[in-house]
Amino acid sequence: EMSASLVGSEMCIRDRDYVLEGNLNYTGAVITWLKDDLKLISSAKETEGLAREANPADRTYLVPAFTGLGAPYWDEKATASISGITRTTGKAEVVKAALDCIAYQITDLVRAMEQDTGMRIEELRVDGGPTRNGYLMQFQSDITNKRVNIPDAEELSGIGAAYMAGISAGVYDLEKLAGNMKRSVYEPKMDDEIREKKYAGWKKAVDGVLSK
């Protein structure tokens, strides 16, 4: 499971490709925390079902600043928190908040990149173990208001390295490889007002853990 995530936005300047990179300290590892430390789940696969069972009106936010916060906050002294808990908040709601915080952090990066570059990101192309979680991928699409494009292969880094080696050796043809990957697509379905209200709640939760 991932302990960190990278979000990259590609720009082409003078026939060269540049990648604007953003690093997150805690994404998939928050699920490991739920399993190993809180004992709320026995496997990551349980999280999707629990998230779907959670009360949709619950406003619990989990900020996983266990080792501070990375981009775009860069606050190594920030501390983790769970806020917005009510009497009806239970295991399902906490698990849902843990999944949601992954999507919120990526949304922070996407919005920062769009603001810094003046370029709109139309689509997120994602990989890694959490992409198998349908609830998380739909929420990621909803909260960013972006199409989320997921390859059938979970770990693209290894595949990409093999493809590059094969292309360099003349074994593979780039054009043919480009059409080999099958993908699933999630489209945003959330109302704009609801999206901004949820994201504002996340920003308020983050503000509460920042050291400065």
List PLM regions with ranges.
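Glycine/Thr-rich phosphate-binding loops that ligate phosphate moieties of nucleotide
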Residues: 9-10, 14-212
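Positively charged, low-complexity/disordered segments
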Residues: 1-8
